Swiss-Prot record:
SUPFAM superfamilies: YbjQ-like. InterPro entries: UPF0145_dom_sf, UPF0145_YbjQ-like. It comes from Saccharolobus islandicus (strain Y.G.57.14 / Yellowstone #1). Pfam families: YbjQ_1. Belongs to the UPF0145 family. This is UPF0145 protein YG5714_0873.
Length: 114
């Protein structure tokens, strides 16, 4: 995956086809904490009675993952990276209404193969 506006290649793989890692800069992390809030919890409770997808939580989860990913990419750029490999996501419940979403990977400099 490439983020042209950030000029950073991003992948869950250890390598990027067509590129060689020329320098490993270190681990980069992006974190966000989201609160479901009273309204979200109420809507989820009502939807859980009838079953099905809880769209409010899906949207919140997608936004949180993207924000964590963007923050991780920003950290990589601060180190001078032009790629991040081995990206992973993790999440933790901090309390009944707050979740922590983490994106992490290895910031690297890559060069395009000739």
């Amino acid at each position: 995956m490439s983020y042209p506006e950030a000029n950073v290649l991003v992948t869950t793989a250890e390598t990027i086809p067509g590129y060689t890692i020329v320098e490993v800069l270190g681990i980069v992390v992006g974190i966000t904490v989201r609160s479901r809030g009273l309204g979200g919890n109420l809507m989820a409770a009502l939807r859980s009675l009838v079953g099905g997808e809880i769209k409010e939580f899906v949207e919140m989860a997608e936004q949180a993952r993207m924000q964590a990913l963007i923050r991780m990419i920003d950290r990589a750029k601060e180190l001078g990276a032009n790629a991040v490999v081995n990206i992973r996501f993790d999440s933790n419940e901090l309390n009944q209404s707050m979740d922590e979403i983490i994106a992490y990977g290895t910031a690297v400099k890559v060069a395009k193969n000739s």
